[in-house]
Amino acid sequence: MRMTFSLGLVGAGQFSGQFSTLFQAHPGVRDVYVTDLLPERAERLAAAQGLAGTFPSYEAMLESPAVDAVAIFTQRWTHGPLVVQGLAAGKHVYSAVPMAITVDEMAAIIDAVRATGLTYMMGETSHYHPATVHARNQIAAGAFGRLFYAEGDYVHDMDLGFYDAYRYSGGENWKETASYPPLLYPTHAVGGVLGAWRTHAVSVSAIGVRDERGDGVFDRSVSRFDNDVSNATALFEVAGGGSFRTNEFRRVGYPSHIRESRFRFFGTEASMEQLATVALWQDKKGVEDISELLEPTPTLAPDDPSLAHIAPELRAAFTSGSAPVHDRSRLPREFDHLHNGHEGSHHFLVDDFVTAVTTRTLPPVNAWVAARYTLPGVIAHESARQGGVRLEIPDFGDAPEA
């Protein structure tokens, strides 16, 4: 008989409701509970989806023997301490991105995983994006030749849904946290590059652009993070030779709702480039349009009632399903007709975490990989604050074999 486990959702915001449906449907998950700082949100989600119950606090959830694992869907700067707290309480942990926002927080997570032997996984969507999957396959086949350069963009304008999202999560003082530094949210760009190119960043130089909107967001006098930068670019050196560049843009004339993360890879024999609606494979003989191979199929109508609390500009991220390049054969059949999201990644994220817990194996985006997706942005942020000075990026090494 297959092992099953129970799961507690931490946070009942815009994201967790989409994932609770998938966790409940997975044959490896027995019961799903939820807690939120606003109890009415937890009660509303539990009632809407028929969850097993609610807890009055995260601490109460961790103390309960009814919960074997937790999935953290809280504000992005809160993850590090919550993850360590969960592992220390004996729970397996799935966490939304980013892993953490300081080097010390990441080190603490890795130490806790090593000490407890419990599962930790960061839910990085771009690891499963069609472009990343295709590039990963082509790299494995040697089609690029020697890969020497790549680019990853996370281009999401604040006007396209982010104001509503920050108001929803931040309450009346939402502007304090809407100024969250772009480079401290690096994984949708870095993860798509390093999810295909098996290397890691060793140094970085980054430049930030000060915001000029003047609406109290990205205002250092208001910002909890002392941040006035809304757009930033980072150039990374990688181990073994080569480089990659990322863009983190929050004020940009670009249709973020069509494709907010996009990637490009360049090798000595071939290259691949992705834009909002077009993707190309190129070699020394010519160009092949691979757009259809990487195009996700919608799994939910944008006006579905389950998306009513999500800004219209953000709904595409919660409806985009698998692309032809995805191999769905390993997914549970229970997912076949369920909503997906973020270019088909949600089904794979849930299945990889559940599989890791039930088989006691390392998930693809384990603590060591998560650090390599997150830490480059933390150091890049510091480089930008120092005017672009080149800084070395520490590394926690490869994940253990078992």
Residue ranges and their predicted role:
Residues M1, L9, A69-A71, D283, ...:
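C-terminal helix-rich "cap/oligomerization" subdomain common to oxidoreductases
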Residues M1-Q49:
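N-terminal Rossmann-like dinucleotide-binding module
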Residues Y33, G53, A69, Y149:
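Short, Asp-centered acidic motifs that coordinate Mg2+ and/or phosphate
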Residues L51-Y58:
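Conserved SAM-binding strand-loop segment of SAM-dependent methyltransferases
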Residues S64, D68-A69, Q75-R76, G80-Y128, ...:
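Beta-strand-loop-alpha-helix segment that lines the small-molecule cofactor/substrate pocket
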Residues G90, G117, G142, G241, ...:
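Glycine-centered short loops/turns at secondary-structure junctions
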Residues T119, S126-N227, A232:
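Predominantly a Rossmann-like dinucleotide-binding segment in NAD(P)-dependent oxidoreductases
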Residues L184-S306, H346-P363, G377-H381, D395-A402:
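Contiguous beta-strand/loop segments that form the cofactor/metal-binding neighborhood of enzyme cores
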